[in-house]
Structures are given as C-alpha cells and as structure tokens.
Amino acid sequence: MHVAVALLQAGQRVATIDLDSRQKSFSHYVENRRCWVERSGLKLDLPTHYCVARGFGLRLDEIEAQEFAAFAEAISAIEQTHDFIVIDTPGSDSYLMRLAHSMADTLITPLNDSFVDFDVLGMIDQNTFEVTGVSHYADMVREARRQRRLVDGGLTDWIVVRNRLSTLSSRNKRLVGEGVEGLAKQLGFRAVDGFAERVVYREFFPRGLTALDHLNEDTLGGRPSTSHITARDEVRLLIDALRLPIDERGKRRAAARAEWIAAAAKPLETHDLLAD
C-alpha cells in the first residue's frame, strides 16, 4: 500500500490487484482508505483496484482457467491506461502467484527479520550460520526470472526487504543480515532495509492510511507523534531504494496537482472576486 501511494503522489497512474483472494488484506486496506475518504471528506490518493476471485471447480485446470481469465481481464482493463500495476500475491504457492512473479518488472519480497522467515529463501548451517542451500521460494523466483528472460529478454529487479527490524543491535539481527547478504550474491537480488517494528504501521490500517499521507488531527484523529515522522522518513528511504522507473511526465502531473491543491486551499483575493 505504501508503494502504491508513493507512486500516486509522484503523479503516476496506479492500479492495484489483489491475488490473495482468501485473506484479501490488500483489498481491505484499499477499501478502508476509500471509506475513510467518503466519511471524512479528505482528499487521499486512491488507486484503481481489482481483486481476483478464487476459482471453483472439480478439477485443478478448471479452477486455474477461471482465475487466469479474471486476472487477464483485470490486466487488459488497466494496462493501457496506467503507469504502474502493483500486485499483492498470497504467501502460498499457486498458478497465479507464479504467473505474477514471472510478469513482474520489480519484485518486492518482504522478509521479517528472523530465521523463521529466512527459511523460505535459504537454509543455514546450525553451527556457523552460513548459507548451505536455496529454499523453495527462492527456487520458484529463480525459475520465474528465467521464464521472463525467455519471453521478452527482460530482467526482473528482485528486492528483498527486511521488515520488522529491531531498533537495537542484536546477534540475531546481525546473523540474519549476513545470511541475506550472502544469498543476495548467490541469487542476484538486492537487499534493503524496510520498516522497523512500529505500532503506527498497524494503526494506519483501519483508515487505510500510510506514513506518506498528510498526517494531522483530521486524518489520524490526533496529533502525529515522533514515531509517525520517523515512519514517514523510513518509507521514503525504502521507496528511493526501490529505484522504481517514475517518469518525468508523472512528476509534472504531481507538481501541477500539488499547485492546484495549494491554490484551492487559499482564500480568494478581493480582485479575484470583483470583475473589472
């Protein structure tokens, strides 16, 4: 959600697709934001959103065909009219999850800062904590990137984002970091620090807010704290690290929109009210 809002604020036309039709966390986040806009009257950027429904049938091929048709319909509706499509995939393996990975220009894999989450990427030696092998998810991504190269010669920029980072140094934090860096060299992804463990991120969800929104008493229901400001800086650093291809046309749209909003917020001068 933070990536989508960052792109919207940069003047990009953004669509979002939720492939996790069981949990629907992404869809609920967008819907919460939409409802808060309607209830509060605030001007918050909203993406064009789609949620691909689960397929039903007796055979796996029937289910996959239904889901592919729904996904293809969503892509066809937005690919010519939007600059970015942000897709949320389920944690479980599925046909659409693999397809989305193989289509991605930028793949962001969030990883909680623990060896429990690290296990989906690689295996480690119990004594030395050195990486000894590649796990199932990393294998799947490697195959998806290979398929992408075969189709159009494109190279997926794979970024592993370490989330829920402790603000304090610890042996676990150091060892996980060393493991991620080791795998980055082996698998060809970029490792970047993401979000620290902050309560404010969980507080944003009910209203669909992000750390990049203009946070005040109207949006939050209270004054922003130092933690809110720190979270905003943290998100901006992450967005910069992603190196998303934001074009100049989008930047001009964002500047024009900001100028219009600033002008709309100012009271009219006397000479604007009276005709010559």
Give short role names for the model-derived ranges:
Residues K24-S25, F118, R202-E203:
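A short beta-to-alpha transition loop/helix N-cap that caps and shapes the active-site region
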Residues R149-D276:
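C-terminal lobe/tail of nucleotide-utilizing enzymes
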Residues H2, A6, L99:
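Active-site signature of alpha/beta-hydrolase-fold catalytic machinery across serine-
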Residues A10, P90-D193:
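Conserved catalytic-core segment of NTP-binding enzymes
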Residues V5-I85, G91, N216-E217:
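P-loop/Walker-type NTP enzyme "switch/lid" segment
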Residues N32-W36, Q126-T128, T210-L212:
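Short, hinge-like loop/turn segments at secondary-structure boundaries
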Residues M1, F68-A72, V235, I239:
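Short, well-ordered alpha-helical scaffold segments within catalytic/effector domains
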Residues E67, D117-L121, A231-V235:
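Phosphate/oxyanion-binding active-site loops and adjacent basic polyanion-contact surfaces
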